[in-house]
Each structure stands twice: as structure tokens, then as C-alpha cells.
Amino acid sequence: MVATYYVGTCSWTDRTLIEEGSFYPPSLKNSAERLSFYAQNFNTVEVDSSFYAFPAERNAHLWVERTPTSFLFNIKSFSLFTFHKTPLSALPYFLKEELPENLQKRSHLYSSQVPKQWLKMALDAFLSAISPLQEEDKLGYILFQFPPWIEKSREAMEYLSWMRENIKGTIAVEFRHNSWLSEENRGEVFRFLRKEKLSYTCVDEPQLPWTVPPIVEATTPELITRFHGRNKSAWEKKGAPVEEKFAYLYKEEELNRWKETVNKKSPDVERIFLMFNNCFRDYAIVNAQQMKLFVGE
């Protein structure tokens, strides 16, 4: 078995990429035109905006229409579903109306504060919004990126099991607290992910006391790696802008080492996703294009 490679970036609408002007022709004036052009160059993309607000089902239909049949969208989970602080204003109106009255007056919510029945309703609404992608076999994975303060715990693992019960398709899980991947815990974590059919997501990022190591492992037929860059000084700087944190252009030899690593896993999986999140200017585009050449896509 030879795996299919999916190589792309974690946004096609990044402001600094558009301003850079080196990838998109200047004649392209909107997101729709840029998506069509992007899909001529790559076979997958990650949607980051879904972390901040529910995607519109109409947009999902349009994404299907504007991309080739084999093109895959990967959707980043809405913030509330991954233990992040979520503005009440980010919720669709009908969901706000269904909240208990005392919660409707808050400015922000955490998932731990809402009734489980309401959380299930919110999850179903989110899944309904992206259902056109699933119906047309254009949904790669839904990414659940935990925040750095969520340590390995029984409660967090039970929550992932609950998500698995309620979501069809590929769920990618990215841990950002190193307790999940410590030498003591990683074996148990990988066994749990395999049992629940959850896709572990490897990350390449600066190696600091609080970050996670780049351990390559497949817990489902998908091998997923996200490249955050290695801008160590920016990650160490308190309050560094997001753009600065991801301002890192991988060297060819760094990408080549990754190619060799994932190629060894190719016989054991069906799909390999290599997603570049170093979204600053055209860095992610350049590195994704290089990786495409390296893996023969």
C-alpha cells in the first residue's frame, strides 16, 4: 500500500500572503477567486476561520463547487469545543437563545460551564454547517487543537471519547501540553487514540520546556503533521504577535529530513497530510511547494 500525500497550507486568505503579492495574481480580487487558484496548486487546505466562528453552510457548498473533486478541506474546530475561552458573540443567535439565562449575560464561555445537552446541540450545528464537505467526500479531518494549559487527564480523555461518539469521519487531535507526550505517558496516550480511532497530530515547532516533541506516530490510517515553524525567540517572547511567531521559512534540508521520516510510515497508512502553518508572507506556500516536490506530488 502506498499512501496518498496531501500537502497544503493552513490558510489561503492570510493577510500577509495576499499583501506579499508573490503567489496570487493581482487580478484575483476576492477569497473565492483565490481559493480556485490555490486549488490549482495544492490538493488540500486547512480552514482556520472556523476556530473563531461557525462556518456558513452556504460557504461549504461554494467551497465544494470551486475546487477539484479530489481536493480536501480540513476544518479547525470551533474554539468552544477545545477548552478555549470563547466570546458569546461568536455563537450563532439560535444557540445563544438556548443557553441558560445566567450564561446569556456572560461575555465569554468555556465548555465546562455549559450543559452537556447544549454542547451537543452546538456540536451538531457546527457539523451541519460543514456537512456539504462530508457529503461530497471533501472533508479531510476536523482538527481539535487543545490549548497549552490542558494537561493529560482522565477528564480530557473522556471528553475526546465523547467527541468520537458524536462525530463521523477523521478527528485529528493536536496536544500542546507536553504531559501528553512525555516518555511516561505517550504509550498510554497512543493506545487510547488507537482504541478511539482518533488521529494523533504531530507538530514541528520550537523545542522549549513547555512545547511538545515532534514524535511521528500514526494512530489511524492517517498520518498528520502540522508545521508551525521554529522561530524560537518569538515563541519565548511574551505577547509576541501571531505573525511573528510563525515567521519561519524552513530550509530544504529540514524538509528533506521530514520527507524521509514520513516516507518510512507510508506503507502503514492510507493518507499523509503535511500542513504548513508558518503563515507569514509566502513562507507556508514556498515550503508546501518544496514539500510537494520532495514527496513527488
Which residues does each predicted region cover?
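Residues lining hydrophobic/aromatic ligand-binding pockets adjacent to catalytic sites
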Residues: M1-E297
